[in-house]
Amino acid sequence: MNTNRYTRRQFLERSAAAGALLLAPGRFLAASTPAKRTAADQVTLGKTGLKLSRLGFGTGSNSGQVQHDLGQEQFNSLIRYAYDQGITYFDCAQSYQTFPWLGAAIKGLPREKLFIQSKIGGQPEDILTAIDRHRKVFNTDYVDSMLIHCMVRNNWTDPWKRIMDAFDEAKEKKWIRAKGVSCHSLPALRGARQSDWTEVHLVRVNPQGAFMDGENEAINMTTNPVAPVLDELKSMRAKGRGVIGMKMVGNGTFLQAEDREKAIRFAMSRPELDAVVIGFKSRAEIDEAIGRINAALA
């Protein structure tokens, strides 16, 4: 028997399929062409599985003074504008002057589409009450990511064990969905990377080294070498951690457009970074950041 002979039905089916491809080449091309990456993409935060926009809105420039100076109404408007541009990640902290405002700013937005990250500094006596306060202020059942704020010592995990345990309890209660730490020195950054407790890292990074982590166990606010931080980022990524870059525009000191362009292109070239966060005070700044990120990813 000749098994290579086609039946009339097979011939017609294959002819129809070939004709469909000829009639709709655009559809075939679209399916094979990867989508362009943008600032508004919903990316995955490490192994947490949580989704957030690639670009986040930071509400804590100079401890939130920059955003607070806008006034509540203009702050609300700016948050809504960012959301309309596809930014769904909003970053806050209990110590920011904008902390009492964020709940009103996001009121009415679909909670399931937002990623809210906040931070708690120091060692509150009742850390669960402090975490619950975030839920009340933000008018939400949960905070997507809660960080221990501004660590500077290598062995911070020892004196902060009580705080870490409370974060674990809050996660079990579903008050928070992920936990982590923001660091302001290389020793603290190494300690965070070495700790299996850490799920999310908020890391200062830009190619100029401005306000990046250095070896001093203090809040480093000078220019420091970039390479040691990049080494830590690679190790974090190897562990499946969620990694977010901050100080993208040098704590607001990159006044020249070429410096901002260089920094954003650098960040977008780093596969270790899931997302970045920038503090904004105007629609023009949001538009510029989105434009530069989109161009860098093109």
Where on the chain are the PLM-derived regions?
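N-terminal binding-site loop/beta-alpha segment at the start of enzyme catalytic domains
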Residues: 2-113, 166, 172, 266, ...
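Alpha-helical scaffolding within the catalytic cores
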Residues: 36-43, 99-100, 127-134, 186-187, ...
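Conserved, mostly hydrophobic/aromatic
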Residues: 45, 57, 90, 116, ...
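Acidic (Asp/Glu)-rich catalytic clusters
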Residues: 47-49, 103-111, 134-141, 193-196, ...
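Active-site groove signature of glycoside hydrolases
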Residues: 138-154
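Beta/alpha (TIM)-barrel catalytic core signal, keyed to glycine-rich beta->alpha loops juxtaposed to Asp/Glu
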Residues: 150-298
